[in-house]
């Protein structure tokens, strides 16, 4: 009986469906123990040892797989990490395009910022003096609401909430003379 048990243990150790075989072996053992109570305690302990080593081995394999998955994901760039965190925080980011025609339209633009929407503002339909006032109001509101206001064109600005990162390189405008006539950048001296 001991040889048969040893062979079953070896076969079940290498079997693909180890969980069900160990359960079957565990169910059979109490019956055998009841029949042969005269066996010394050392022989009863030996069959249990392979069962104890199998589950930690599975856990070791699972932890190796998890480590491999973690190592594969390590060389992500910052943009990929930012995209992942942004996807967790917000499901969708929308960009509203606004063409303000009067100063009162600035309040509507700020309300969109409060709702965490990006706003592309084009001041082409406003006079320069009104556009400066409107831009001052929007810039102040963006500071209070921890937003970001960036110039993206000669008369266009991008207003974004704090959870949106915009990476804009220097944009060379094809109409260089247009920028000089319609430039209301507040940081100019």
Curated annotation (Swiss-Prot):
Keywords: Cell cycle, Cell division, Cytoplasm, Septation. One of its GO terms (biological process) is FtsZ-dependent cytokinesis. This is Cell division protein SepF. Gene3D superfamilies: SepF-like protein. It holds the Pfam family SepF. Belongs to the SepF family. It is found in: Cytoplasm. Residues 18-65 are annotated as: Disordered. GO terms for cellular component: cytoplasm. The keyword Cell division applies. Cell division protein that is part of the divisome complex and is recruited early to the Z-ring. Probably stimulates Z-ring formation, perhaps through the cross-linking of FtsZ protofilaments. Its function overlaps with FtsA. It comes from Streptococcus thermophilus (strain ATCC BAA-491 / LMD-9). Homodimer. Interacts with FtsZ. InterPro entries: Cell_div_SepF, Cell_div_SepF/SepF-rel, SepF-like_sf. Residues 22-35 have a biased composition (Basic and acidic residues).
């Amino acid at each position: 009986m001991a040889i048969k048990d040893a062979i079953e243990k070896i076969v079940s150790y290498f079997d693909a469906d180890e969980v069900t075989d160990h359960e079957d072996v565990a169910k059979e053992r109490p019956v055998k123990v009841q029949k042969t109570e005269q066996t010394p305690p050392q022989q009863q302990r030996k069959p249990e040892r392979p069962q104890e080593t199998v589950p930690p081995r599975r856990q070791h394999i699972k932890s190796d797989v998890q480590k491999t998955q973690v190592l594969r994901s390590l060389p992500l760039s910052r943009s990929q990490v930012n995209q992942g965190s942004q996807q967790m925080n917000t499901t969708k980011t929308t960009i509203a395009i606004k063409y303000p025609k009067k100063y009162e339209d600035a309040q509507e633009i700020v309300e969109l910022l409060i709702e965490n929407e990006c706003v592309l503002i084009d001041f082409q339909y406003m006079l320069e003096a009104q556009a400066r006032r409107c831009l001052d109001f929007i810039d102040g509101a963006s500071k209070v609401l921890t937003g970001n206001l960036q110039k993206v064109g000669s008369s266009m600005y991008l207003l974004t909430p704090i959870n949106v990162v915009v990476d804009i390189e220097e944009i060379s405008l094809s109409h260089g003379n247009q920028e000089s006539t319609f430039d209301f950048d507040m940081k100019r001296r």
